[in-house]
Every structure is written in C-alpha cells, then in structure tokens.
C-alpha cells in the first residue's frame, strides 16, 4: 500500500485521522452504558466482546459478575472471566482472580475451567482468530506499486471551504495493470473525497502481469490537507507515534488506524501480517471495519492463512453492525460459482441492506446483479439503471457504467441499444488500456441477441 498526495493549486496531501464506525457492541458503548448505570446494556456489550477475547471487556465482565451488576452475582463466573483476562496480560484481572479463588466452593474451579476452555485463547485461535504467518503474502506486492499515479483535482467545494480529510481504499489490480471498482473502507468526512479517489485509481497505472494471472489485492491511503507543505512531515511522524501509544493503551479505534498506517505508509512499509494483530485487537474491541478487515483477510489469505469459515464469521459480525463492505463481500461470496435460488436470495438481501445505508458499492453491485439476472429469477433492469444513475451521477469516463447499462438493456430485450452501449464501454476501456477480452465477449452476446448472465464486476 502507498500514500498518495493530491495536488491542485498548491495543495498536497498529508495524514488525517480516520474514524471507525460504531459497532452494535464496542468498548466505548459498553463503558458509556456502565457510566449511566445501564447495567443491562453494559453487561451485554462487555460479554459480547469478552467472548471474542477482548481482555478489558473480560475484566469488566468479571467485575460486574462479582458485584451482581446486570446479572446474578457469581464469584465462579467472576473468577473465570478474571482468569481469562489475566491470561491475556491484565495484572488487575490477576489480582481479582487471586482474591476470589480462596472463597470458591468445592468444584467451582471445574465450572470456571469449562468457561475458560470455551473462550480461552486456544479455543478462539482454533475457531475464530487468524493464523498469522510471515510468508502469507503469496501475491507479488510489487504489483501494488503504481507506475503512474493520476492526480485528480482537489474537490472544489472542499477547497472553497478549506475542508481536509482522507480516504483508505482497497482495490484489485488486474493483469492489465489497471484497477477495477475500488472499495472505500474509510472516508472522512463522508461524501467529500471519495469521487476524487475513484478517479485517481481509475486512471492510475500499475505493473502488468502475465495474461490469465489472478487479480492482486492492494490498498492505498489518500490524505487531503489544505495548504500543507513538505515541512509537515515531522507532524506525520508524531501522529504515528501518538496513534501507536493509544493503540498500545488499548483503544480499539487507534488499533484499527495503526493497522492501516503499518500497511499504508511507505515509511513503515510493513507486510499485511504485521497489521493483522492490530486489526484483530480492534475487531475484538467491536470496531466493525476492523472485523471486516479480519474477515476479508481470512477469505483471501491476506496476511494470514486462508480460512473461509473464520472469515465468514467475522464478516457476519461486521455486517450485523451495518458495515457495508462486509455486506457486499458476503453477497459476492454467496454468488460464487453457480449460485442456487437461496444463495441468490441471500446475496440480494445483503446488497439491499448495503444499498439502503447509502453505500456506493452496495448500489453498484446490486445494480449489476439486477441487470444480469432474468426478471423471472428476481432481476430488475429498470431499477438497475436507476441505481446506476445514483452511483455514477456526473461520471463520464468509467466503462463500468456502460457495461451495467448494456447488460440491463439486453435483459429487457433491447439488443440494439445494448450493442451501442457496450461499444461505448469498449471505447472508454480502450482509452484506459483495459483488457478488452471480457467486454468483447459481452458485445458478441448482445450482437447475437443473447443477454449476459455471468459475473459482471470483479470483486
């Protein structure tokens, strides 16, 4: 992953703080609930995080059991959770466990051991946590280094108002050395810089690979600051140190940001395997985007061994908190291979949820699904084009908009329009130096009066 500066009229980019979306249960919400004496919610949230292996939540849950707050008082459960937190390095938890142990009734330690066995590190490693390996970077990371970076204009409204911010994007680099449909994982402030980043990635060039090679997963950190100069670099170093300090202090959001900095800044240039422990800590702390990062990494073997069942578990947790990237990923996973009616229904449901939240990718992938599915099977070409207009309003040079529109037109039986639209997609793709093979295949289908029902978008 690289850091890209956006320059326009004397503007260039430096690091900005990214904020994590709130989870259904996270340390902050649990602590706030406890402060308000809402012990029922605090207990529920601490328990959810404690069962993921979060040591601070395990200690707080132990304290609540010992005091009978939010649940029936139980020294056995208090001892069990304090012991788990102690196993994870908490000195306060060890002191509490040592205090409780002499007062336990005979046989109580066996009950506590059963709880520890279910939620101890060994069990979580086997059932949920990624297996981090240094050589898990199977892909050629050099392909993520741009040959040419396209610098879009600084957004005019942001410039006129002096707005600063940043975007963290993940994307696939195809064998032709160009990107497709980047996923904007973080954007702050929302709705300001995303379009500029998509334009940059659409027109940037990367190293080509042999035809038929698999796409490679890459990430890029875009930072927008008004009126900054090169002497701001020490502030970047200071920000990294401060973020690490907060991350080491147990703040889940700082842990997520530091994970991004590790793989995002050329100055740190760490492999994904070094960021995974920080993403995991943040995920255990209830940060949905970190849960998505862990889940996606497990699906792809990105920084860890590929373990799909674990990945799907984390993705579902993130999706249940409304994390749109997780929802889209679950949808695309359901559509792998030859999906049956139930898998199609699941995929459509996840995409509907992502689209309803306003997610760009939710609307994009839903429009592609509706455009390439026969009406009898749940497709809806008119709605596909309506969603497309929302996603690509004002965008003129991305072939994807024409690809989806052509598929929708063909699905409605208007093959003449589909052929013309697909030719426009091919014209724009040629200007971007895309591999034309899949586009020409679709053009041939429309020319022969056949709709396209295969996968349209690379994820």
Give the location of each predicted region.
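Structural signature of tandem alpha-helical TPR/SEL1-like repeats
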Residues: 38-41, 72-80, 233-238, 268-278, ...
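Hydrophobic face of amphipathic alpha-helices that form TPR/SEL1-like repeat modules
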Residues: 26-33, 60-67, 98-100, 257-265, ...
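Short proline/glycine- and basic residue-enriched helix-capping loop/turn segments at helix->loop/beta transitions
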Residues: 126-170, 196-241
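Alpha-helical adaptor scaffolds
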Residues: 27-54, 296, 300, 332, ...
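Short helix-capping/linker turns of helical repeat alpha-solenoids
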Residues: 37-38, 51-55, 67-69, 74, ...
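Terminal, low-structured helical/coil segments at or just beyond the last alpha-helical repeat
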Residues: 99-144, 378-379, 404, 411-413, ...
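A short, well-structured alpha-helical segment
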Residues: 174, 178-210
């Amino acid at each position: 992953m690289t850091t890209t500066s956006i320059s326009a009229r004397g503007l260039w980019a430096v690091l900005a703080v990214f904020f994590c979306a709130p989870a259904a249960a996270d340390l902050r919400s649990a602590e706030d609930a406890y402060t308000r004496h809402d012990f029922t919610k605090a207990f529920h949230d601490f328990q959810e995080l404690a069962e993921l292996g979060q040591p601070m939540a395990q200690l707080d849950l132990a304290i609540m059991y010992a005091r009978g707050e939010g649940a029936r008082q139980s020294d056995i459960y208090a001892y069990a959770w304090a012991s788990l937190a102690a196993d994870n390095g908490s000195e306060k938890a060890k002191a509490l466990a040592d205090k409780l142990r002499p007062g336990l009734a005979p046989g109580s330690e066996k009950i506590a051991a059963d709880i520890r066995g279910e939620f101890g590190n060994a069990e979580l490693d086997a059932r949920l946590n990624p297996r981090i390996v240094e050589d898990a970077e199977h892909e050629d990371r050099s392909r993520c280094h741009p040959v040419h970076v396209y610098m879009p204009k600084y957004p005019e409204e942001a410039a006129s108002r002096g707005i600063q911010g940043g975007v963290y994007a993940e994307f696939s680099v195809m064998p032709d050395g160009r990107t497709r449909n980047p996923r904007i994982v973080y954007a702050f402030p929302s709705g300001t810089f995303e379009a500029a980043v998509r334009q940059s990635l659409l027109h940037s060039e990367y190293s080509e690979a042999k035809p038929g090679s698999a796409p490679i997963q890459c990430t890029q950190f875009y930072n927008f600051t008004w009126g900054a100069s090169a002497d701001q670099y020490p502030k970047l170093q200071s920000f990294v140190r401060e973020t690490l300090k907060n991350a080491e202090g147990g703040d889940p959001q700082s842990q997520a940001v530091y994970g991004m900095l590790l793989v995002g800044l050329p100055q740190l240039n760490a492999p994904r395997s070094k960021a995974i422990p920080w993403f995991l800590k943040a995920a255990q702390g209830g940060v949905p985007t970190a849960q998505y990062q862990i889940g996606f990494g497990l699906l792809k073997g990105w920084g860890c061994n590929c373990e799909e069942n674990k990945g799907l578990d984390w993705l579902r947790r993130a999706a249940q908190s409304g994390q749109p990237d997780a929802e889209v990923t679950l949808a695309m996973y359901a559509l792998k291979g030859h999906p049956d009616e139930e898998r199609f229904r699941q995929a459509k449901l996840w995409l509907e949820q992502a689209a309803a939240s306003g997610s760009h990718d939710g609307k994009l992938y839903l429009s592609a699904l509706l455009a390439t599915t026969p009406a009898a099977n749940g497709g809806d070409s008119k709605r596909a084009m309506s969603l497309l207009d929302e996603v690509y309003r004002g965008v003129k040079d991305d072939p994807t908009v024409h690809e989806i529109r052509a598929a929708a037109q063909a699905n409605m039986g208007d093959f003449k329009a589909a052929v013309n639209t697909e030719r426009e997609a091919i014209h724009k793709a040629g200007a971007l130096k895309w591999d034309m093979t899949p586009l020409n295949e679709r053009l041939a289908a429309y020319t022969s009066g056949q709709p396209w029902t295969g996968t349209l978008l690379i994820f």
